Amino acid sequence: MALKTFNPTTPSQRQLVIVDRSSLYKGKPVKALTEGLTKSGGRNNLGRITARFIGGGHKRSYRLVDFKRRKFDVEGTVERIEYDPNRTAFIALVSYADGEQAYIIAPQRLAAGDKVIASEKAVDVKPGNTMPLQYIPVGSIIHNVEMKPGKGGQIARSAGSYAQLVGRDQGMAILRLNSGEQRLVSGICLASIGAVSNPDHANINDGKAGRTVWRGKRPHNRGVVMNPVDHPHGGGEGRTSGGRHPVTPWGKPTKGKRTRSNKSTDKMIMRSRHQRKK
């Protein structure tokens, strides 16, 4: 996929850089594999804002994507690659030999007509195939990696992302993630071969605030431009720096403050993403 730029007929067109999606399927998604999606506007069941700066945006239908890939040893054919408004990656419609259909995350270099298969045994190392980490060759680029067997892929699912299998140790697989973290995952967890599609997503420029609003994001107001009644960083004469380490509107440290608290899985992390990247 290439990037598209536009003639500078307006200031926002001058800045605009988007992904060229002309090669994707142009019709509607498979109705049996979609669900309705209700907008929350960032509000909970009491009507109170629990996630700020969310609201509006184009209406979406939710595509049911198969992250588990537990249809073992049944070959599937990729019918088409589709756009999915609910994620940054593209999705692939797979038709299996028994007539069933499913959406999967499309890896790079997967095209219509390609064959994919998931198995509990070793299968070909080619994009879209899924097998346990214990059978994947060391050094392979993988995505949609399970953290618990049978739970479905959780690691490396967004556009252009991937993990690398760098070793094995006593039934565990050692993964290197995009963040620089190295961690252990059970060797019986499933993973798919290849890197996730749409790597150019990192290079897009919306060009104008309105295009961001179409995505359901509202204007994000900085605390430093508010009044003291509204934010700990507010107030002061003229422009100020906030006068303290960054905090949320409720006074909790933010911007780099570590929030991880799951001590039971600390032992699975061999190298923290916070260590200096070599």
From Swiss-Prot:
Keywords for the protein's UniProt record, in alphabetical order: Ribonucleoprotein, Ribosomal protein, RNA-binding, rRNA-binding
BP GO annotations: cytoplasmic translation
Annotated stretches, region: Disordered: 218-278
Keyword Lipoprotein: no
InterPro entries found in the cross-reference section: NA-bd_OB-fold (IPR012340), Rib_uL2_dom2 (IPR014722), Ribosomal_uL2 (IPR002171), Ribosomal_uL2_bac/org-type (IPR005880), Ribosomal_uL2_C (IPR022669), Ribosomal_uL2_CS (IPR022671), Ribosomal_uL2_dom3 (IPR014726), Ribosomal_uL2_RNA-bd_dom (IPR022666)
Keyword presence, Protein biosynthesis: no
A Gene Ontology molecular function term of the record: rRNA binding
GO cellular component terms, semicolon-separated: large ribosomal subunit
A Pfam entry, by short name: Ribosomal_L2_C
Biological function: One of the primary rRNA binding proteins. Required for association of the 30S and 50S subunits to form the 70S ribosome, for tRNA binding and peptide bond formation. It has been suggested to have peptidyltransferase activity; this is somewhat controversial. Makes several contacts with the 16S rRNA in the 70S ribosome.
PANTHER family cross-referenced by the UniProt entry: LARGE RIBOSOMAL SUBUNIT PROTEIN UL2M, RIBOSOMAL PROTEIN L2
UniProt xrefs under NCBIfam families: rplB_bact
Subunit structure: Part of the 50S ribosomal subunit. Forms a bridge to the 30S subunit in the 70S ribosome.
Protein family (similarity comment): Belongs to the universal ribosomal protein uL2 family.
UniProt protein name: Large ribosomal subunit protein uL2
Source organism per UniProt: Rhizobium etli (strain CIAT 652)
